[in-house]
Structures are given as structure tokens and as C-alpha cells.
Amino acid sequence: MGAAGSKLEKALGDQFPEGERYFGFENFGNTCYCNSVLQALYFCVPFREQLLEYYTSNKSVADAEENLMTCLADLFSQISSQKKKTGVIAPKRFVQRLKKQNELFRSYMHQDAHEFLNYLLNEVVDILEKEAKATKTEHETSSSSSPEKIANGLKVPQANGVVHKEPIVTWVHNIFQGILTNETRCLRCETVTARDETFLDLSLDIEQNSSITSCLKNFSSTETLHAEDKFFCDKCCSLQEAQKRMKIKKPPHILVIHLKRFKYIEQLGRYKKLSYRVVFPLELKLSNTVEPYADVEYSLFAVVVHVGSGPNHGHYVSLVKSHNHWLFFDDENVEMIEESAVQTFFGSSQEYSSNTDHGYILFYESLGPTK
């Protein structure tokens, strides 16, 4: 990779970003699903910064227990502290830990990059929550052995001994979490019932010759609940016809969109890859949001691409935008690409096409406030 590395340095020349590192990852037998997602996360700057901060504050703890997050922090630190600007790194410790922890990733079979991303983010959240709880328990034990709180110098007994626990919000939530609101309107009494739910990514159904904007509109389209799908209205105290729609109540800072390219075909009894052409813009305006976030804008910075004609075989690569340059990561290989090359990964407008490189997971960063 020395030649390829020097080629990349030559291509960037004096435009090589100060302090940045572009390293390919070694493949340990079908670990491209992991490599492509890790590259996208490394170039998700807020995620990288938090992880490096975590590494710095934890490396002094001699008896720190190894977990997936410490292995990931170690890998990111290894990349960022390289003396060389380009090269190849073997994420061996991380991959070994992943396989040890989850049997799903143990085989040499083709794995799903979206499943891996989901698992990784949820695992990091679990680790951070456990650590936050342990710190809180330690703090509470040392600060007070009495179950009573002190307010203005007076002891205030807790109501019936009930402690209201606030949910722990980690930095992963601050970066990736958004809130969806599910609105259901009873067609008899017009009462609107709203139910909120959080998300770390949005999985969108796709159609041929469509765009992310139209997929998002479909995601938020109004659905009528009738016949056996009637809605139980609390006000009418009975099953009623209703209209239901999903909107984004709070958009995340980093919006991750998963395109549902693998569809189960009943007649075939198996999954099929949808190679549909779905345009994903470099700048995205969200229109299915609730005030005050109307028309919040996002900029694309990474794409995980699935290469291949079927769901059970193929390859994953990633496209990453770093300091206004677009880079193509294919395991050990890293090269510079033109921004216009991104559109070659939209998909195919014909059913059968020689182009099998399709955008699968998209990473967008908010250009405005989402807090």
C-alpha cells in the first residue's frame, strides 16, 4: 500500500489536511462490512472526538476491562497518532473482540453492514450507561449514607421512598439520536393522539427511480386505519377509523439513513437485492419535520456502499468526505475521487445492469442547530 499511500499524498499535495490521517483497514476474511462502517464512523468528527477523549481519560486506568468500546477507542487512537499520513492498519483486536462477543459476526459468511452499525452503536450506549450508573452509585454512596435529601439545610424525606430515575443520555444519543412522533387522528371525534419514539437511524423503503426526499415523504405519508386495522380511541372508548402519520419531532445532529435494499420475496422464499436508482443529494433538506425544525438542512459526509447482485454475497466499500475532499475506502486501499463520482452509486435505473455498486447507508451532518 506504500505506492497507493504515496499516490494519495501526491494527489492531495499541499492540500493534505493538517493532522488528518487516511488509513485503509486490513480484511480478515469477509470483514469489509466492518471496515466500511468503521471508516464512516472515523470521519464522523463528533463521534471520533468523543471516542479519542474517552481513550485519553481511560488509558491511565490500569485495570480497565477490555470491551468493544475500548478496542474501538484504541483503534481510533492508533490511526490519529500515526507518524505517516497514509498507510494500512490491521483492526485485529477490534475484530477479535467483536467475534468473541457476538456469534453473529463469528463466521466467515457475508455479514450485513447495517446490522453491524446498529449492534456497535447500541453496544457503545450500553457500556456508557453502565459506566455512568457505576459512577453515580459510587458518588451517591460516598456523598451520603442517609436516604434523606437536604434542601435549604432541612432534611426532606423522599416521597414513599420512590426515587425517580432520569434516563441516561450518553454522547452517542447527543450525536445520533432523533425523536419521531407517531400521530393518530380519530376520524370520528378528531382527537389526535401522539406517541414519541427515539431512533439512532432511519430505515427507508425504496422505489425505482426515486430520491431520498421522496422516500422520506413516503415514510411520513398518511395511512388510513380501517376494517381490521381500526384504532382504539380512548375518547370514543371504541374502535374507530383513523389516520396515522409519522413525523420527525427532533432531527438528530448526525442523520443516518439506511436504504432497505434487501427485500424478502415470498414466492422465492429468500431475500433479493433491490438495485433501484435512489438519488441521495449532497445537501438534504428535511421537510417531514415538526416546528421549530422545519426545513433543517444536512450535508452528506459518508456512504457505505454494497457491491454485488445479492444479499448473501458481495462486498462493502465506503465513500467519505473529509476537509472538502472525497475519498474512496476499499479495505486496504484508499484513493481520492471527484465529488461527481458519488452519483455513480445511486443505483441502476434498469432491472438488470452491470452496475452493482449501490449506496446502502448514508451519513448526513446537520448544518444548523438541532438541539
Curated annotation (Swiss-Prot):
The keyword Protease applies. PANTHER family: RE52890P, UBIQUITIN CARBOXYL-TERMINAL HYDROLASE. A lipid is attached at G2 (N-myristoyl glycine). Disulfide bonds: none annotated. It catalyses: Thiol-dependent hydrolysis of ester, thioester, amide, peptide and isopeptide bonds formed by the C-terminal Gly of ubiquitin (a 76-residue protein attached to proteins as an intracellular targeting signal). It is found in: Nucleus. One of its GO terms (biological process) is proteolysis. It comes from the Eukaryota. PROSITE patterns: USP_1, USP_2, USP_3. It comes from Arabidopsis thaliana. InterPro entries: Papain-like_cys_pep_sf, Peptidase_C19, Peptidase_C19_UCH, USP_CS, USP_dom. Coiled coil: none annotated. This is Ubiquitin carboxyl-terminal hydrolase 3. Keywords: Hydrolase, Lipoprotein, Myristate, Nucleus, Protease, Thiol protease, Ubl conjugation pathway. A motif (Bipartite nuclear localization signal) lies at residues 83-100. Pfam families: UCH. The active site is at C32, H315. It is an enzyme of class 3 (hydrolase). GO terms for cellular component: nucleus. The keyword Nucleus applies. Its EC number is 3.4.19.12.
